């Protein structure tokens, strides 16, 4: 399955930091698999498109490697697939900054259906700032910290979703 041409999503920000950034997009025909619903790979793609947009507002956009000689590498992610979506359906994705330290960010994308706001999927990510000079972890530049800190302070006021930090395993009952 080869991806078709993609259009970057339109990103809408409210004036308040308390209003989570929201990206709207539509399920494309080429994202549909043999089961008739959106393929798991395209959930990752949709979340990645949103990541690029959110990173731009956090000072970590596509110009970050050239501007600061740093990059953001993903250390790990969890995706929860909650409900199916189909060709042409609208999606809305928000991003909550869960935690930040001197070189890492931990955030959660939440995808809901654009019509009825039902939960579709969640994507939890842990990422690290990397110096491109030595390919090792490095502290965020102050310009990035100055953008991340106020967002984090506001997002700390939001509820932490139950799914955050969970591990994947088959639960076994004692018999």
Q: Which sequence ranges carry the predicted segments?
A:
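Terminal targeting signals and extreme-terminal segments of soluble enzymes
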Residues: 2-92, 98-175
């Amino acid at each position: 399955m080869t991806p078709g041409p993609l259009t970057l999503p339109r990103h809408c920000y409210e004036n308040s930091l308390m209003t989570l950034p929201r990206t709207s997009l539509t399920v494309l025909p080429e994202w549909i698999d043999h089961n008739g619903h959106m393929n798991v790979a395209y959930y990752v793609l949709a979340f990645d498109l949103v990541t690029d947009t959110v990173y731009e507002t956090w000072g970590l956009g596509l110009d970050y490697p050239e501007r600061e000689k740093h990059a953001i590498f993903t250390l790990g992610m969890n995706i929860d697939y909650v409900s199916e979506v189909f060709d042409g359906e609208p999606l809305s994705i928000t991003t909550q900054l869960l935690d930040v330290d001197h070189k890492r960010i931990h955030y959660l994308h939440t995808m809901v259906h654009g019509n009825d706001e039902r939960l579709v999927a969640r994507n939890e990510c842990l990422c690290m700032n990397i110096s491109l000079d030595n390919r090792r972890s490095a502290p965020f530049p102050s310009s990035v910290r100055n953008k991340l800190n106020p967002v984090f302070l506001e997002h700390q006021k939001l509820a932490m979703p139950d799914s955050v930090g969970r591990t994947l395993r088959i639960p076994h009952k004692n018999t």
